[in-house]
Amino acid sequence: LMSKENAVKFAPVILAGGSGTRFWPRSRRARAKQVLALEGQRTMIQQTLARLQPAAQASEVWVITNSWLRDVIEQQLPEIPQSHVLAEPCARNTAPACALAAFLLERTEPDTVLGVFPSDHVVANTKRFTEVIAAGIKLAAAGDNIIVLGVKPTRPETGYGYIEQGELVEQDETPLGFKPITVHRVRRFREKPDAHTAERFVAAGNFVWNGGIFLWSARTLATAVREHVPDMAAPLEAIAAAYGTPEFDAVFAREYPKCENISVDYAVLERRSAKGEQRSNIYSLPADFGWNDLGSWASLHEHLGEDDKTNVMDGATTGLFA
């Protein structure tokens, strides 16, 4: 997203490393759900790239995946430079994946805003998505800010982490005439709750699901990693330094396993939020664009709706629930 006014560079990072076993038997390990056409004709990762296109050119997009999905992702997303499709040598959760992109870009373009987007999400209202992401980019570029997208709970779900929202700091009017984008300070991140706690969170009204979409500048995340997970910094620095050289694959394979296997939520967001609502510079924006994470057949079922025989039918998935 380059405009003459703010000239903010935006680089989306698509996370496509999951092994997709929750959609077994349709998504055996070699064909994880990201590369399946679970809804419509395009695969989930193709849909993810398409909805990012208004905000970023394909040449600016990065994909973090694994060795067995790399080839199929390169086939499905030929617009993305192959040098931007990075295959983790081992699974290390989301903190090293997010931080790797930040360390790579920090070397040359530290003010670039990175957006983290899981590849198994479905978004019904892409215009609203584009608008919320644009607001998030602007806020992430304005300083040492971390932006998280929160989903208003529709049920006391125990499968997601929750974000406890604090002070309402602004309501941006939007050019397309949708409802204003509300920006809250984040008070705390809460782990996946038990059923009783989830009911309490939903009743309280100021808790939203952590949808796993984040925005921050390369410098902000790299600096936060050095502060909160310092042992991760040296391996990632070494990998970033080797990027674009013949040694890259060897350095990646040697250094990446040294990174702790930890989510970015635990590694950075929870630790940073401990500084307090006014000092952590973490803000939540609403993921009010018809979000679903399709993490399992149950959420696909909810997303597609039911026919009168309570069988969910979709062109790409006909008969799977029959």
Residue ranges and their predicted role:
Residues 2-9, 218-322:
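Left-handed beta-helix
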Residues 2-15, 21-32, 37-134, 151:
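Conserved N-terminal catalytic core of the sugar/cofactor nucleotidyltransferase
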Residues 8-10, 58-59, 81-82, 109-112, ...:
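Short coil/turn connectors at secondary-structure junctions
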Residues 65, 117, 193, 216, ...:
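A conserved hydrophobic position in a structured secondary element of the catalytic/binding core
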Residues 91-96, 155-157, 195-197, 291-292:
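A short acidic, often aromatic-flanked loop/helix-cap motif at beta-alpha or helix-coil junctions
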Residues 105-110, 173, 273-279:
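Alpha-helix termini
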Residues 126-256:
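Conserved core of the sugar-phosphate nucleotidyltransferase
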